[in-house]
């Protein structure tokens, strides 16, 4: 009981620790993908987006399939879970789900280890993951990896519970939990396959195993069948996913694996698991040498090694966020690593205290500074975006047109409060003469415009012809009494002002400073990868932006200002200007 109370206290403290850094903001293209889909499900009951105008902004992961219907390339599972929170509490409530799942995952680690190894081992294992920097950062990154970890742990707990009490209802709920995982991330379909293999291994030794497997499959059908039906309706085949639109199925190869696996192994030690990683690997191996734990050894092997190899073979080179792909395996290595410690320590209390306290001290010395650094940066960028939102809520009427860069639009898009323009469709109108816009790094020119109608309408236009077409479309979209606002840097507003006709002008409404200290650079340089791997592609296939923003040039450059996707977070303010006309 004391250990359980201590675990609950740890979960509460961890959640409040995350809340200190939490800001209701979307700082990545992936987050825009999941949470705009959340809004669409909550307000319209669909994952489909139909732009009202060729100017309408669409996030980087939204692709047109047919008849001006756009769908996100990501799985909708996390969006379905967040939709009720959005309806009841707005954007902030929906964004709280991920940190909640991150903290609850610690309790699941405690429950798994305590049930499997004894009461004294659960709390140290949970504490170890509480200081893991990748887990803590992605608790506030608003992507899908934390949710996968939660359901992986819950599913593992139910499987081990089933082994102790092989009842059909436990198998059914386990199947439902494991079935949620591929609805959250398509590639993680290998996890429920591992769970099914684990159950199948018990057919010879457990009389009720076959019936439990059928119950497990019935449980899996609850979340997976709706996903397959959606895939059939949206993509024309139940086995197709949004990744096929972007050619992701061609993004894996042996050449990538041989080039990247040494870096991944290094990063797993330095950024991912640190000291528990070798213990975790050895623990999985040692499980095979005990006849009572062979099945668990195979389960944990299948939950860790295949997904690690898969992402090592992915075309995108290792970067500061690559460890997010392997985050679920860190929980597995922690569980098996503590099992290894238990074998080494046995029942000696002094050895238990010495080894566990040493491991926790080293892990804390490694993980806490990295966690504080990553979370502090997220807090800073999130504060910038929430401040921008507050300024817009104060000055820009709901439903008005807003022209802003992608770094702002991908966040503001979640609320649906304003109508956002795809600024890159007409970017030349906002580019100062003789130099590029400060908010448009070289990477931005490589991203195809998402709004297909806008790409066709404005793609070959320039100068006065482009401005006249833009003027006509934006005011048609705004309506007779609508208003149009710009939220851009001064030089961009000045460049646009030169294109205005007589009787038009820009009225300054407000300004906001978006300065942010440069974040510490972590290992790995961002080098543009060769994609598509299978050759050039047409249509809406696009080069995937890294999760934290544009690719920087290789090598250290400490003079660069920090960026929020394509927005330079320097000392120059963003100006909120109203486009006025007679």
Describe each region flagged by the PLM:
Residues 1-12, 120-123, 176, 197, ...:
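Signature aromatic-anchored transmembrane alpha helix within multi-pass, membrane-resident enzymes
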Residues 10-11, 98, 122-133, 157, ...:
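Short helix- or helix-capping micro-motifs
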Residues 93-117, 154-158, 285:
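Transmembrane-helix motifs of polytopic, lipid-linked glycan transferases
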Residues 104, 200, 270-301, 305, ...:
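Hydrophobic, aromatic-rich transmembrane alpha-helices
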Residues 134-147, 409:
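Short acidic/glycine- and proline-prone juxtamembrane loop motifs at membrane-interface regions
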Residues 158-167, 191-224, 228-229, 284-289:
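Perimembrane helix-loop-helix junctions
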Residues 355, 359-410, 435, 442, ...:
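Membrane-embedded, lumen/periplasm-facing catalytic core of multi-pass transferases
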């Amino acid at each position: 009981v004391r250990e359980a109370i201590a675990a609950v206290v740890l979960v509460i403290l961890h959640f409040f620790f995350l809340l200190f850094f939490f800001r209701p903001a979307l700082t990545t293209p992936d987050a825009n993908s999941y949470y705009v889909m959340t809004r669409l499900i909550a307000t319209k009951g669909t994952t489909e987006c139909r732009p009202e105008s060729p100017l309408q902004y669409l996030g980087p992961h939204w692709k047109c399939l047919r008849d001006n219907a756009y769908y996100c390339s990501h799985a909708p599972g996390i969006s379905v879970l967040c939709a009720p929170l959005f309806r009841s509490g707005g954007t902030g409530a929906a964004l709280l789900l991920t940190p909640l799942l991150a903290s609850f995952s610690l309790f699941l680690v405690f429950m798994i280890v305590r049930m499997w190894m004894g009461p004294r081992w659960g709390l140290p294992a949970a504490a170890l993951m509480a200081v893991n920097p990748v887990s803590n950062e992605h608790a506030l990154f608003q992507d899908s990896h934390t949710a996968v970890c939660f359901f992986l742990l819950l599913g593992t707990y139910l499987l081990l519970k089933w082994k102790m009490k092989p009842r059909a209802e436990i198998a059914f709920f386990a199947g439902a939990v494991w079935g949620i995982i591929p609805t959250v991330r398509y590639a993680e379909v290998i996890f429920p396959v591992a769970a099914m293999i684990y159950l199948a291994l018990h057919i010879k030794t457990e009389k009720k195993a076959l019936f439990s497997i059928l119950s497990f499959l019935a449980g899996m059908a609850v979340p997976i069948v709706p996903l397959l039906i959606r895939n059939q309706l949206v993509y024309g085949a139940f086995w197709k996913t949004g990744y096929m639109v972007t050619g992701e199925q061609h993004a894996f190869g042996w050449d990538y694996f041989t080039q990247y696996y040494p870096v991944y192994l290094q990063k797993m030690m330095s950024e991912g698991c640190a000291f528990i990683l070798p213990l975790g690997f050895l623990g999985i191996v040692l499980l095979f040498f005990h006849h009572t734990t062979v099945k668990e050894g195979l389960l944990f092997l299948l939950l860790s090694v295949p997904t690690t190899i898969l992402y090592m073979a992915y075309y995108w080179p290792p970067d500061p966020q690559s460890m997010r792909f392997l985050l679920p395996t860190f929980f597995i290595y922690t569980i098996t690593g503590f099992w290894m410690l238990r074998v080494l320590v046995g029942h000696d209390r002094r050895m238990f205290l010495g080894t566990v306290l040493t491991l926790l001290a080293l892990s804390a010395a490694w993980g806490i500074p990295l966690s504080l650094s990553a979370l502090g940066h997220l807090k800073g960028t999130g504060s910038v975006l929430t401040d921008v939102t507050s300024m817009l809520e104060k000055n820009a009427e709901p439903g008005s047109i807003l022209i802003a860069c992608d770094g702002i639009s991908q966040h503001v898009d979640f609320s649906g409060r304003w109508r956002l323009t795809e600024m890159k469709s007409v970017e030349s109108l906002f580019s100062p003469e003789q130099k590029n816009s400060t908010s448009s790094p070289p990477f931005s020119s490589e991203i195809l415009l998402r709004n297909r109608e806008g790409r066709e309408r404005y793609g070959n236009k320039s100068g006065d012809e482009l401005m006249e077409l833009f003027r006509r479309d934006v005011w048609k979209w705004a309506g007779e009494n609508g208003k149009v606002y710009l939220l851009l840097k001064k030089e961009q507003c000045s460049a646009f002002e030169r294109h205005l006709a007589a009787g038009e002008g820009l009225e300054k409404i407000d300004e906001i400073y978006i300065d942010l200290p440069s974040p510490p650079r972590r290992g790995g340089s961002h080098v543009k990868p060769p994609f598509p791997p299978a050759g050039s592609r047409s249509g809406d296939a696009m080069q995937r932006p890294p999760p934290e923003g544009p690719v920087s040039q290789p090598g250290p450059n400490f003079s660069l200002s920090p960026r929020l996707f394509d927005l330079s977070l320097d000392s120059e303010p963003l100006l909120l200007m109203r486009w006025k006309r007679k």
